[in-house]
């Protein structure tokens, strides 16, 4: 009989991706982008609590950001989280590049086995084909969380 055991030597890594290139009417976009900032903070804090290394990638513009912001490489701990939180605190509700360019960059940086959590304002922002392509490339799960779905009544 074979028993499948969890391999504790495997490092779980995650990329947290914040997209602000939304397909929403302008009146709806800003509040949903603000919700995305909160969701991103919550996801990063949860990964910190679980001691899971994570990278961060975004297309959000950050006013006066002093350090790296659009891509923060794998890390864990207070300094890593602070870099991301500082950017979220300075973030404007404006994208620096398209969602397609962002996801192309994410896919180029992706590694086999790396999971992805994509946070986005609208339900329609990320296509199923984009999710499938990233999942097929890494062989890992891709979770898309839309602020529109989270805040829906």
Regions found by a protein language model. Name each.
Residues 1-153:
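Exposed, interaction-prone extracellular/peripheral surfaces
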